[in-house]
């Protein structure tokens, strides 16, 4: 989604810089449109070999401090082959000294401060943009960018490869499995761009991108079409993003199918610190993730359509509160709801038979979890690890772990402090008894009693400790009238993972005492 927008932004920036580069925006009040066109024409003559630009109209309104270009066409015929056109460009309140400030920055980039910004314009509006590049093309009905500014410290940073160099490096490895070293030039180039721009707000309407992806041994050739009705946001600055929203996205990949997204949003994304390290040429290591944060990313109303036209409601997914420290994830939340699995969409007879045995045509699935790791306290908490199938039941897990330190071998160093597992039955138990009875030609009620009797028989070999007896009673109660079953582990003191691994040799009663086992039903 970002690439076509960056192409247009880059085009507008060079137009703005070129138009005022010879005589300066400050003199437009004296010369108005004619001087603007003269400066623009002279700048066009300085384009590198393989690039050309034309325009049909170019005007400057002194009263509104607005430059307007019509019928803009820009072509690349060298290493980067592309063809871009824009029906109309409006630049309001262009920076009076952008060209001079940029020239000064380029003359001594080592002296630049990372947060030194060069304002480009108060507002830039683009209408009717089209670009063709290779096997891809993009169109945009309109786009508006307010408060665009550039940070030459990043854009002119020493050692950053050019886009041509990045393309050459990737092309050379196209027939091989790419390694991390192969994509480092691309990562560094993109870090320069993302750290080199900022803007106050943006809004785009009716964007469409099409591309043909060549066939691979694993996949056929694919025609991809990506459309968005509108998207916009506010507050992006050097790798720190505020709010952004999208409405009406469709991704069609023939012949594989289509995905539609009713709405998407993101907020409070921070990746300035990792980008700065990449820009400096630091090798990627886990600690580079420190400082990366995701406030929230959410996709609402997702739907997939199969090649034969069948629709699959995918639902809503969100990730939030993602944070890292010392190279490990220390917090995060995941939520997913609304996936509908239909018997009619199952690809094989065995799957459809499973639906029939349960007496269902559709399963509605949701899941989620919340995670935190306090590295100073060496404590990890996991909450609401939930899997819910509306038609069958819901499983929910919470856990507290102690002595958790990052690094290899953590599974031998940690300790279990508390675990709570709860199952709330909607109909699964009764459906399972009915399905089993149907296969064995038995009565469901009689089969239920047989299973309860088997629990009693098995319990006899587990000893007569109070914890075991209470667990058996709870399990029998649940089987007789399935509503809920809760399993809690609350040891008197945290139990090391190594001790848990060795506990298999202990008598059942001793194991129950070690882990503080409690099982209750229908509470």
Which residues does each predicted region cover?
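N-terminal Sec-pathway targeting helices
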Residues: 1-17, 21
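Glycine-rich, small/hydroxylated-residue low-complexity segments
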Residues: 18-523
């Amino acid at each position: 989604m970002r690439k076509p927008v960056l192409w247009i932004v880059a085009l507008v920036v060079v137009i703005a810089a070129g138009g005022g580069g010879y005589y300066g925006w400050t003199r437009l009040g004296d010369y108005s449109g004619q001087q603007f066109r003269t400066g623009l024409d002279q700048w066009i003559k300085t384009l590198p070999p393989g690039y050309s630009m034309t325009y049909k109209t170019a005007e400057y309104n002194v009263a509104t401090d607005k430059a307007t270009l019509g019928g803009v066409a820009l072509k690349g015929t060298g290493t980067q082959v592309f063809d871009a056109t824009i029906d109309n460009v409006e630049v309001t309140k262009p920076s009076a000294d952008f060209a001079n400030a940029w020239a000064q920055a380029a003359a001594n980039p080592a002296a630049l401060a990372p947060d030194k910004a060069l304002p480009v314009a108060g507002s830039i509006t683009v209408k009717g943009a089209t670009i063709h590049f290779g096997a891809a093309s993009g169109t945009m009905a309109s786009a508006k960018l307010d408060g665009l500014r550039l940070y030459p410290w990043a854009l002119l940073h020493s050692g950053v490869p050019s886009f041509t160099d990045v393309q050459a490096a990737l092309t050379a490895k196209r027939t091989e499995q790419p390694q991390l070293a192969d994509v480092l030039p691309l990562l560094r180039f993109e870090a320069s761009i993302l750290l080199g721009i900022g803007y106050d707000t943006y809004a785009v309407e009716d964007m469409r991108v099409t591309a043909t992806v060549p066939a691979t041994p694993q996949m056929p050739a694919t025609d991809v079409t990506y459309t968005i009705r509108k998207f916009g946001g506010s507050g992006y600055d050097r790798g720190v993003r505020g709010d952004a929203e999208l409405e009406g996205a469709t991704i069609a990949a023939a012949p594989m199918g289509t995905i539609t997204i009713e709405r998407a949003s993101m907020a409070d994304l921070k990746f300035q610190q990792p980008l700065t390290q990449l820009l400096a040429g630091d090798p990627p290591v886990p600690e580079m993730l420190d400082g990366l944060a995701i406030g929230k990313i959410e996709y609402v109303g997702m739907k997939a359509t199969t090649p034969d036209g069948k629709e699959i409601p995918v639902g809503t997914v969100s990730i939030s509160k993602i944070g890292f420290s010392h190279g490990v994830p220390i917090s995060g939340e995941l939520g997913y709801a609304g996936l509908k699995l239909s018997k009619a969409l199952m690809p094989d007879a065995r799957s459809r038979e499973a639906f029939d045995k349960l007496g269902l045509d559709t399963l509605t699935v949701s899941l989620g979890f919340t995670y935190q790791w306090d590295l100073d306290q060496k404590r990890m908490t996991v909450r609401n690890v939930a899997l819910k199938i509306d038609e069958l039941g819901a499983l929910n897990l919470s856990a507290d772990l102690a002595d958790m330190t990052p690094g290899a071998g953590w599974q031998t160093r940690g300790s279990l402090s508390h675990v709570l597992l709860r199952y709330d039955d909607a109909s699964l138990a009764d459906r399972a008894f009915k399905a089993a009875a149907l296969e064995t030609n038995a009565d469901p009620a009689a089969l239920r009693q047989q299973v309860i009797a088997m629990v009693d028989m098995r319990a006899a070999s587990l000893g007569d400790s109070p914890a075991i007896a209470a667990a058996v009673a709870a399990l029998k109660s649940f089987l007789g009238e399935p509503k809920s079953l809760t399993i809690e582990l609350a040891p008197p003191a945290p139990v090391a993972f190594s001790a848990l691994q060795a506990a298999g040799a202990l008598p059942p009663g001793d194991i129950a005492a070690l882990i503080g086992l409690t099982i209750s039903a229908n509470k």
